[in-house]
């Protein structure tokens, strides 16, 4: 189902002090943008922002870059992030929100940004063979991520899709990533520190298991 147009979204985003209108201008300078040397985590496809809002408000010593493509969803993410910080009475200074096509992620990040962790949560599985190169875990994308992931940087990947998960294991191997942790049922695995996304809650209620892995960049 397509999200309805939200005429308020773009003006509200542009007046928001943590929304980056032109992320390309910060390429290689994201630590300067945050004005500190804290680790930077990147969420690809942040949706309505629930995941990054929880992470950011719970981890003030980590910086977060949250990316999606549509103003409508980013507008909701902006509001959810603000709400989470307000409820905890915390200052919002460790999240940057922006619109960016993930296939062109190298236009806004490079090796000087030294991203410590990437989150990929319930991305489009692109099941048709002709579309598989669009997957966010495809080897073509992993090659881009390697450019700005620091040494031993991590990718945390969650999905409900069995085929995507199995084929992603091969992508990570081809892309020179080591699988550090894997489970085919995250919610019964005993793994600590999981933050559920909107999709994750929905799938869990439907009895669909969440597959999860942590991949480490190898030289």
Curated annotation (Swiss-Prot):
Positions bound to substrate: 128, 160
Catalytic activity: guanosine(46) in tRNA + S-adenosyl-L-methionine = N(7)-methylguanosine(46) in tRNA + S-adenosyl-L-homocysteine
Residues noted as binding S-adenosyl-L-methionine in the record, renumbered to the chain: 43, 68, 101, 124
Pathway as given in its UniProt record: tRNA modification; N(7)-methylguanine-tRNA biosynthesis
Pfam family, any one: Methyltransf_4
Isomerase listed as a keyword: no
GO cellular component: tRNA methyltransferase complex
UniProt keyword terms in alphabetical order: Methyltransferase, S-adenosyl-L-methionine, Transferase, tRNA processing
Enzyme Commission numbers on file: 2.1.1.33
Function: Catalyzes the formation of N(7)-methylguanine at position 46 (m7G46) in tRNA.
Family per similarity comment: Belongs to the class I-like SAM-binding methyltransferase superfamily. TrmB family.
Name of the protein in question: tRNA (guanine-N(7)-)-methyltransferase
């Amino acid at each position: 189902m397509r999200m309805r147009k939200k005429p308020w979204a773009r003006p509200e985003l542009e007046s928001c002090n943590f929304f980056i209108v032109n992320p390309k201008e910060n390429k290689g300078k994201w630590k300067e943008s945050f004005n500190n040397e804290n680790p930077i985590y990147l969420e690809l496809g942040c949706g309505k922002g629930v995941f990054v809002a929880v992470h950011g408000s719970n981890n003030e010593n980590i910086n977060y870059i949250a990316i999606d493509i549509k103003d409508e969803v980013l507008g909701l993410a902006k509001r959810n992030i603000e709400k989470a910080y307000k409820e905890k009475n915390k200052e919002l200074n460790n999240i940057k929100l922006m619109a960016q096509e993930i296939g062109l992620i190298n236009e806004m990040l490079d090796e000087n940004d030294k991203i410590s962790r990437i989150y990929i949560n319930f991305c489009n599985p692109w099941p048709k063979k002709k579309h598989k190169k669009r997957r966010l875990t495809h080897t073509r994308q992993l090659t881009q991520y390697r450019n700005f992931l620091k040494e031993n940087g991590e990718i945390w990947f969650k999905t409900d899709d069995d085929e995507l998960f199995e084929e992603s294991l091969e992508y990570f191997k081809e892309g020179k990533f080591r699988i550090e942790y894997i489970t085919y049922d995250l919610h019964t695995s005993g793994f600590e520190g999981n933050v559920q996304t909107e999709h994750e809650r929905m799938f869990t209620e439907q009895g669909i298991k969440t597959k999860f892995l942590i991949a480490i960049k190898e030289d």
